[in-house]
């Protein structure tokens, strides 16, 4: 049975960023991911799933060591941002009001994930299990035990469920969740 400090289920933006930041602190990390994204090529069509990454998120990605990788891919600065509710209430932000060249960047989610995955490769204390999925989770007082669908058994002090809104890991741990559906 493999031992680790932290088992992270899901290597999306949240799981991969968390893995990099925890590994930088010297923790022994295992990352379990069912599938990895397609590699980046400049001539690929743009993905529709994008995020508005704030300057604070840029700082986090830089601390995780992934920002330099992202700068080699596609990103677009944004200078103004407006959000609104159904009742018409709107909030507007403008980088000029803050004396900043931009508020942040619009970046394809897949590219953020790829930059973080590339950074994860630099850490000898991160091991990735992919393609793999958790099929059993047992919680103990001092650790949790995970069984992966490839037969791997892991024992971790902490398990982080970063496997999305429909998290199987959260359900296996008996943790409920709630969602708010909003019209887009």
Residues of each region from the PLM?
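Conserved N-terminal helical subregion
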Residues: 73-172, 179-184
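N-terminal FAD cofactor-binding segment of flavoenzymes
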Residues: 45-85
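Short acidic, glycine/proline-rich loop/turn micro-motifs
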Residues: 41-44, 95-96, 174
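Residue-level detector of anion-binding/catalytic polar loops
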Residues: 28, 67, 127, 176
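Conserved Rossmann-like nucleotide-cofactor binding loop
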Residues: 14, 37, 166
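Long, low-complexity, intrinsically disordered polar/charged segments
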Residues: 1-8, 33, 39-40, 142-148
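Glycine-rich FAD pyrophosphate-binding loop
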Residues: 23-48
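N-terminal Rossmann-like FAD-binding beta1-loop-alpha1 element of flavoenzymes
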Residues: 4-31
């Amino acid at each position: 049975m493999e031992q680790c400090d932290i088992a992270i289920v899901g290597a999306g933006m949240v799981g991969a960023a968390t893995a990099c930041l925890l590994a930088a602190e010297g923790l022994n990390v295992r990352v379990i991911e069912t599938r990895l994204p397609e590699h980046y090529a400049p001539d690929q069509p743009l993905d529709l799933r994008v995020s508005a990454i704030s300057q604070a998120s840029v700082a986090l990605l830089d601390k995780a060591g992934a920002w330099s990788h992202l700068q080699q891919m596609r990103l677009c600065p944004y200078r103004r941002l407006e959000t609104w509710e159904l009742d018409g209430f709107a909030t507007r932000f403008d980088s000029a009001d803050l004396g900043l060249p931009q508020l942040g960047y619009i970046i394809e989610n897949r590219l953020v994930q790829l930059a973080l995955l590339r950074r994860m490769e630099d850490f000898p204390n991160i091991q990735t299990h992919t393609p793999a999925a958790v099929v059993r989770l047992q919680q103990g007082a001092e650790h949790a035990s995970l069984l992966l669908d490839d037969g791997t058994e892991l024992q971790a002090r902490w398990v982080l469920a970063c496997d999305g809104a429909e998290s199987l890991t959260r359900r296996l741990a008996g943790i409920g969740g709630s969602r708010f559906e909003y019209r887009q």
